[in-house]
Amino acid sequence: MKRILVTGASGFVGSRFVERWKGEYTILAPGHGEMDITDVVSVERYCMEKVPDVVVHLAAISNTWYCEQHPEESYRVNVEGACNVALASARCGAKLVFFSSDQVYNGNRESGLLTEDIAVHPENVYGRHKLEAEQRVLGICPEAVALRATWMYDMEREGMPTHANFVLNIAHAIKEGAQLRFPVREYRGITWVKEVVELLPHAFDLPGGVYNFGAENPLNTYETACRYCEMLTGEQDSAIILPDHERYPEHVRNISISMDKAHRASGGTIRFHDTLEGLREADR
């Protein structure tokens, strides 16, 4: 049985990955006391002792606002931590699958679905750190796979960590009769975490490099919210969702991803629903 080391196994994605795949892989899920990703000696010691076949690196500080306020901590975890995991993976011969982010695209001016081969110019701390982590990790482990994940969501599930997200925010607003504003000048993929977890093992066999990994979405965030609210209420013009024309005044914020590269490289096995299709599936 293949041995999979998961960093961040108690987090949003990691906990769901462990639950889904624990019967089909030997899952290694060390806590911080067993393996501290900011300590290269700790990471190498654990990896050399356990000798995983694959390392899925999910541990990160992913709150973009927090990273802006604490850039040194973000760098230590999101860049240096990733490099430590890469060094240990290379030393023990494990395939590394590392989660990056669509935030690397947040300074781009292109329209449409963005591909991995375009130059990127991230404008926030988190995006810059994830981009540097990609570059340094692939320098250490050329066969590593860096997955640029999107904003993710799940329904509330007992025993699973859940944070405020797109679907829960809208569902709660409908229940409470509140209103929410969503930006008109933003385009981004929004992905059901269940699909990420289901498709992640297919990424183990990808050639080394950077891949977008999530739902495509041609709609702006306001349009997406309107369509999801309509799914829940049956009302086409709900007063719950309001347009926000003020956010991103400098330029349209487009971080929508194209999945063509991963789809081709996986022989078609990595195939996400688009954002609206995923929302319909999740709501069944």
What are these regions (language model features)?
Residues 7, 30, 55-59, 96-102, ...:
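SDR active-site strand-loop-helix element
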Residues 76, 81-84, 104-147, 152-153, ...:
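Catalytic helix-loop patch of NAD(P)-dependent Rossmann-fold dehydrogenases
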Residues 199-247, 283:
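Mid/C-terminal beta-alpha module of Rossmann-like enzyme folds, strongest
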Residues 29-39:
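Rossmann-fold cofactor-recognition segment
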Residues 37-77, 88:
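NAD(P)H-binding glycine-rich loop region in Rossmannoid oxidoreductase-like domains
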Residues 138-188, 194-195:
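NAD(P)-dependent short-chain dehydrogenase/reductase
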Residues 2-21:
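N-terminal Rossmann NAD(P)H-binding glycine-rich loop of SDR-like oxidoreductase domains
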Residues 220-226, 241-282:
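Conserved C-terminal active-site "lid" loop/helix of NAD(P)H-dependent oxidoreductases
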